[in-house]
From Swiss-Prot:
It comes from the Bacteria. Keywords: Cell membrane, Membrane, Transmembrane, Transmembrane helix. It comes from Bacillus subtilis (strain 168). It is found in: Cell membrane. Its main location: membrane. This is Uncharacterized protein YlaA. GO terms for cellular component: plasma membrane.
């Protein structure tokens, strides 16, 4: 039973995890189910006209559902430029509306049909209206096609018009066949109808071979129409089947009603019961930099400060929990902004270059001036600049110079792609900036100096020159500061906590895995707790130690003794049920100022240096915006912190 409840929890969370239904749509569906079920029980009273009441209920239900469609459209219009040309490029903007039609309109009207009397005379009107409503997304596809064709007349392949022909003719043909069968059953037409319905659903929904991807969002308008048409015909045939209908209709109707009420009532349903006992399994997602991520609005401001534009910047992948990097696009350019470091990468200008061709020296000066003009603080004594030609463009690469060892910098540094006087491409690299100017790096040069001095003392190594040779920054993978000494010792520090993450020593006579005294000297550099550390395992070229919070791994590889430190994940499974996650969301919602459009909860591990604890990540999308507000709620204390900077 517990397994079934856990399985059901994951099914319910699927709708949250992928932002399938908005909060407004979910409540509308839930309360409509309850009201229809209650009405079905009431109409059996002898003084109530069952046919008239259920007909009026059907009319009111469809008015309410169209109001729900309007709410979804209002949100989409407010949250993005809702144009046909844009929809043709990124059809995901219509997905919330399509999800509501599939899981709201089709589900609720089907439920209403199940509750209607067999001899009701208004079903034909409802059939016509419902098929017209679920055909609207297909009509939108057709208008979007012609809008895109008008804007990009050379971008259409001949095969696209063949697809357009089928998009237009198939629903028309199915509607004609449907209403012919509604008035008079014909076995040949019935076979043709179900062949088309089932065949098209299999074609649209069955997965293709691995090498071919399928966009289920793009085919959803047809999926909705086919599901509705298939249900209506099956229901119509069921009602016409005299003996079968009389024998099973009452019990089928009651079973369906009870199932949906138990499943979807908004007060206490099967999902609520499942959440009370089931816990997340295999929680591995960890989050750093809590309180330091930037919002999509801040990212857009940063991008526009570098590349001013009056055009709308579209934010892609708005269904993601956390972006890690924000991907924007306009007609003029596209670019990404890292959610933590606030650095720009993969900028690409999409229009023609202008101006005149400059000299290599002028391109160098323009590149450095561009960074300084936008507040970047270069480490001028430690950078080099290289100019090359690629595909007719002048490429300027600014990288951190390794003063101790020769290194190929072909893929390092900030890179500029110039064509004439136009910047056609650009990506930043934090390594070329002064350490104290990087907002996401919390270790100072003095901290690094102290740790290097501690290493020299602990290992009895004479002091020698060292330098920062690389700074990595990635919201998904974390940040790292790499330091190298003249003799090839490499230290890597975590950018957020400033802790030493790894140490690499060139193998020598006294530096090897066999030297147990050396192992303890190295552990002291990592500040391992002396009274608690113990050897966990030893095999061949690897030795592991642990203390109360960390694991230290010694590995010999390619002439180097490498030492890595890991913060131990708590041994126990995630200790909180999904009900605790719901309470965490309710606490966040009580403090939230805007109208909540969609929400999602996700179990995570919060990490900062040695500290690791379980928490809930609560994602909220406000109504009328594609912004995501993220909050971290401590699993034990229920303390709420915003993931984004204040």
């Amino acid at each position: 039973m517990l397994f079934v409840l856990e399985l059901f929890s994951h099914y319910v969370l699927h709708f949250e995890r992928y932002f399938i239904l908005s909060r407004q749509s979910t409540l509308l569906i839930q309360w409509s189910i309850v009201v229809l079920a209650g009405l079905y029980l009431l109409v059996h009273h002898p003084k109530i006209n069952r046919q008239r009441t259920m007909f009026l209920a059907g009319v009111i239900l469809r008015i309410v559902l169209l109001a729900g469609v309007s709410v979804e459209l209002i949100h989409q219009v407010q949250s993005t430029n809702f144009t046909s040309a844009y929809l043709r490029e990124d059809g995901k903007e219509l997905l919330p509306l399509l999800h509501f039609l599939l899981y709201g309109y089709v589900l609720l009207t089907a439920f209403h049909y199940m509750l209607m009397p067999r001899d009701h005379g208004g079903k034909g009107k409802f059939y016509t209206f419902d098929l017209a409503v679920v055909s609207l997304p297909i009509v939108q596809m057709i208008f979007s096609f012609f809008s895109y064709w008008k804007e990009y007349p050379d971008g259409m392949e001949p095969i696209a018009f063949v697809f357009l022909f089928f998009i237009i003719t198939l629903p028309i043909a199915l509607n004609v066949v449907f209403f012919k069968l509604y008035w008079r059953t014909d076995k040949i037409l019935l076979g043709l109808f179900y062949t088309l319905i089932i065949g098209l659903l299999v074609l649209l929904l069955a997965p293709y071979p691995n090498q071919i991807s399928k966009d289920y969002g793009a085919v959803m308008p047809y999926t909705i129409y086919l599901a509705m048409a298939g249900f209506l015909m099956s229901y119509h045939l069921f009602q016409k089947s005299g003996k079968v209908y009389v024998r099973v209709n009452k019990w089928v109707t009651m079973a369906v009603m009870v199932f949906f009420v138990l499943l979807l009532n908004p007060i206490y349903n099967i999902g609520t019961a499942a959440f009370a006992v089931s816990k997340p399994a295999n929680v591995h997602d960890s989050f750093n930099f809590v309180g330091e991520h930037i919002s999509s609005e801040k990212a857009e401001q940063i991008l526009k400060s570098f590349f001013p534009t009056d055009e709308t910047l579209y934010l892609h992948d708005t269904n993601m929990d956390v972006h890690y990097f924000y991907s924007f696009e306009s007609k003029g350019y596209k670019a990404e902004v890292d959610e933590v470091s606030q650095l720009i990468r993969n900028y690409e200008y999409l229009q023609k270059a202008h101006g005149k061709k400059l000299t290599n020296q002028e391109y160098k000066r323009k590149s450095i001036a561009f960074l300084e003009r936008h507040g970047r603080v270069l480490h001028k004594d430690h950078i080099e600049t290289k100019v090359s030609q690629e595909d007719g463009q002048t490429v300027v690469r600014i990288y951190l110079k390794n003063q101790l060892h020769k290194k190929d910098h072909a893929d390092d540094g900030a890179v500029f792609y110039w064509e004439k006087e136009t910047l056609m491409g650009f990506s930043e690299d934090p390594s070329i900036y002064q350490l104290d100017s990087l907002l996401h790096v919390h270790i100072t040069e003095q901290d690094i100096h102290d740790k290097v001095e501690q290493m020299f003392t602990a290992l009895n190594i004479s002091k020698q020159p060292y330098q920062i040779t690389d700074i990595e920054s990635d919201s998904l993978l974390g940040s790292m500061v790499r330091v190298e000494t003249k003799v090839g010792i490499v230290l890597e520090f975590e950018g957020e906590s400033g802790c030493l993450h790894s140490l690499s020593l060139p193998m020598k006579k006294n530096i090897s895995m066999a030297n147990s005294r050396l192992q303890h000297q190295i552990l002291s550099i990592f500040d391992a707790r002396g009274s608690e550390k113990k050897k966990k395992s030893s095999q061949g070229d690897m030795v592991m130690y642990t203390d109360s919070s960390k694991t230290y791994e010694f590995v010999e590889a390619q002439g180097q003794l490498n030492v890595y430190v890991y913060s131990d994940t708590p041994d126990q499974s995630f200790p909180y049920t999904y009900r605790n996650g719901t309470l965490a969301y309710e606490k966040v919602a009580s403090l939230y100022q805007d109208v909540i459009y969609k929400k999602r909860m996700r179990p995570i591990i919060v990490q900062r240096g040695d500290e690791r604890h379980y928490a809930w990540l609560i994602i909220i999308q406000p109504f009328g915006s594609n912004r995501h507000d993220a909050y971290v709620v401590d699993g034990e204390t229920q303390e709420v912190k915003s993931l984004y900077e204040s």
